[in-house]
Amino acid sequence: MELTKIATQNDINRQWIVLDAKDKVFGRLITEIATLLRGKHKPCFTPHIDCGDFVVIINATEVKFTGMKLKDKEYFTHSGYFGSTKSKTLQEMLEKTPEKLYHLAVRGMLPKNKLGRAMLKKLKVYRGSEHPHSAQVAKSSK
């Protein structure tokens, strides 16, 4: 009788995946990114092991949003001091810090523990089409 094989950290073979965000719907792109980071697209997926791939997002500012989200959706921050609540619209976040916008959206779809934080570190977001990971991407595609 053979037992089910459970993947260990040594069995994981990570790839570098480049996704172009140009003209893609933001929410659907984020779910795809979360699936790749978690490793659920692999047959060797194990919930307690970080078996996801590295994901590089290019053209992060050219993503599409449905509805009136660019004007209506707000992100709030609070430092802990009285009266320090600050808000930014989605349009402001996309112009100033698209990297933070992607990290916040993906973080909500990953586990809320050490494993989720390790998965989030494998996400690389860039505004334009240039990225410094071309050596890793070329090596993993072979």
Swiss-Prot record:
One short Pfam family name for this protein? Ribosomal_L13
> Which one GO biological process term can you cite for this protein?
translation
What does the UniProt record say this protein does? This protein is one of the early assembly proteins of the 50S ribosomal subunit, although it is not seen to bind rRNA by itself. It is important during the early stages of 50S assembly.
Q: Which gene codes for it?
A: rplM
Note the PROSITE patterns from the entry: RIBOSOMAL_L13
Family to which this protein belongs: Belongs to the universal ribosomal protein uL13 family.
Name the Gene3D superfamilies on file.
Ribosomal protein L13 (3.90.1180.10)
Keyword Cytoplasm applies: no
Q: What is this protein called?
A: Large ribosomal subunit protein uL13
Instruction: Report if keyword Lyase is assigned.
Output: no
Q: How does it assemble?
A: Part of the 50S ribosomal subunit.
One Gene Ontology term, aspect cellular component: cytosolic large ribosomal subunit
| Record InterPro entries | Ribosomal_uL13, Ribosomal_uL13_bac-type, Ribosomal_uL13_CS, Ribosomal_uL13_sf
Top-rank lineage group of the source organism: Bacteria
Q: Which UniProt keywords apply?
A: Ribonucleoprotein, Ribosomal protein
